[in-house]
Regions:
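Short acidic, glycine/serine/threonine-rich helix-capping segments at coil-helix boundaries
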Residues: 2-61
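Basic/polar, cationic surfaces and motifs that engage anionic cell-wall
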Residues: 12, 34, 41, 54-76, ...
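Short, surface-exposed beta-strand/loop micro-motifs that present aromatic residues
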Residues: 128-132
Length: 203
């Protein structure tokens, strides 16, 4: 689902209006914006009038997260291993992964430095992010994980920490038997540069 806001038109707007119990004219106007902000307020999301990936997850969890036949046993957290303060987009990661011979970005969700959550590879498709654990897992990555000298460091912004927790909580709600892990539990790496088990012990 793409990000939409006031002025947007099309099928995604109709879906949003349907979920919000509005007339479905496919035009994102003031009434849709107001209803969306009411929904976001009730779900502790920023009242910014933007229906982004994080909002879609809250609006349509079944549509976004369970419309596939894969059994999910693990949710694995990664970092992009990029320097603190540097942005890194889904398209940049996709380009890097394709250059390595993969057919798409390896991760399913990417959390940017501003806290926005972006879809990578479709959850319906097996990822390519953790050897031996891809078939029944979801790969979540945050941008960062290294200091400016490329040494491992937890560089997560407050917004990233909040969004990671939010996303993992939603994923756990839909895959209650899935366990949350850091990449470093399965490989001799520092990734994701923080203790996942300790941080998400309550999930």
């Amino acid at each position: 689902m793409k990000t939409i806001t006031k002025g947007s038109k099309g099928e995604e707007v109709k879906i949003l209006q349907s979920v919000l119990h509005l007339a479905q004219d496919g035009i994102f106007g003031s009434m849709t914006e107001e209803a969306l902000n009411d929904f976001k307020k009730s779900h502790n999301l920023p009242e910014d009038g933007i229906c982004d990936t994080r909002t879609w997850i809250a609006l349509l969890p079944d549509r976004l997260l369970t419309a596939h036949k894969r059994t999910i046993n693990e949710i694995i957290v990664h970092c992009t291993a990029t320097p603190e303060g540097r942005d890194y987009t889904v398209e940049q990661i996709r380009k890097q992964h394709k250059a390595q011979g993969w057919n798409d970005i390896g991760y399913h969700y990417v959390v940017y430095r501003d806290g926005s959550i972006h879809e990578g590879r479709s959850v319906e498709v097996t990822g390519a992010h953790c050897n031996g654990h891809n078939l029944h897992s979801i790969g979540v990555v945050y941008v960062g994980g290294c200091d400016k000298a490329m040494r491992p460091k937890d560089t997560r912004t407050d917004a990233q920490k909040e969004s990671l927790y939010f996303l993992l909580k939603v994923l756990k709600r839909h895959y209650p038997k899935a366990t949350i892990h850091g990449h470093n539990e399965y490989a001799a790496k520092a990734c994701p540069s923080f203790n996942v088990k300790e941080e998400y012990i309550d999930l």
